[in-house]
């Protein structure tokens, strides 16, 4: 996760991409994690430990059961950097911690046991980070992103956008929260005359209508399912639609209620550009 965090950050620090482009990438990363139901069931430590038999062998239910230790790990690294900066009044950063780890490796040429990373981080910075590491690594609690991003001049607003929105950066702080969009609650592959479900998300419209992966939706309210995204978007929240679909070659009919999207799309904006760029282009490390 730490290396994933630096992937995009180094592009911004080297001015290969603009600060606004970096924030757009960050908003997309935050959104991907927030829209993963598995984040509520699997901790970062569990995700790492079971990577070879779960993360790298994903199935139709994986979005409901696991979280990416790359994606959430990158956000955890961002949070760690901001916690270290705040607690040390700017004397230490994640950069300086990583450099100290590298110097230690040069002396010993040995790797770091699991608990030693935290111990060395605390010893080097002189900070008590036990609560942060315990909560971040070993529980399924959401990361305090809004609170920490505010310390570097970045605002975070959660919006109930369609799942395909993906997160965004706004040049100006939003003056209002958009009305919630509708959400079908599933991923699907659209074909010319039907949509085949690939993943059904916990708690969404599709799951509540007892739909399953591999179901082939052929009609919505009597009309051929030629564009499920567009047809679903035309239905008002709270309405009931009738679906015709095939499952294992058998035709079924189900009524589905149009649910509002969850407020899980991240929109970032700059509240203090000087503060943000001082963090982004930090040259002390």
Identify what each model region corresponds to.
Residues 7-8, 16-285:
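C-terminal recognition in membrane/secretory proteostasis and scaffolding
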């Amino acid at each position: 996760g730490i290396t994933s965090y630096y992937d995009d950050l180094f592009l911004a620090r080297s001015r290969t991409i603009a600060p606004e482009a970096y924030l757009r990438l960050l908003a997309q990363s935050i959104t991907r994690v927030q829209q993963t139901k598995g984040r509520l069931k699997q901790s970062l430590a569990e995700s790492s430990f079971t990577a070879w038999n779960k993360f790298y062998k994903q199935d139709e239910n994986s979005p409901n059961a696991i979280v990416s230790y790359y994606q959430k790990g990158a956000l955890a690294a961002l949070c760690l950097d901001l916690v270290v900066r705040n607690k040390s009044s700017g004397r230490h950063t994640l950069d300086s911690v990583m450099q100290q780890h590298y110097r230690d490796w040069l002396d010993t040429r040995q790797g770091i046991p699991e608990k030693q990373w935290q111990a060395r981080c605390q010893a080097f910075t002189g900070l008590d980070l036990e609560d942060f590491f315990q909560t971040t690594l070993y529980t399924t609690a959401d990361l305090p992103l809004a609170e920490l991003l505010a310390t570097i001049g970045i605002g975070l607003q959660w919006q109930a956008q369609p799942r395909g929105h993906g997160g965004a950066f706004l040049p100006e702080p939003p003056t209002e929260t958009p009305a919630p969009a509708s959400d079908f609650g599933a991923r699907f592959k659209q074909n010319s005359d039907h949509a085949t479900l690939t993943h059904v998300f916990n708690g969404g419209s599709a799951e509540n209508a007892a739909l399953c992966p591999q179901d082939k939706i052929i009609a919505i309210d009597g009309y051929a399912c030629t564009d499920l995204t567009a047809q679903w978007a035309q239905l008002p929240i709270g309405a009931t639609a009738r679906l015709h679909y095939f499952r294992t070659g058998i035709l079924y009919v189900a009524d589905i209620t149009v649910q509002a999207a969850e407020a899980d799309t991240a929109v970032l904006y700059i509240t203090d550009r000087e503060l943000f760029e001082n963090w982004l282009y930090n040259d002390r490390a």
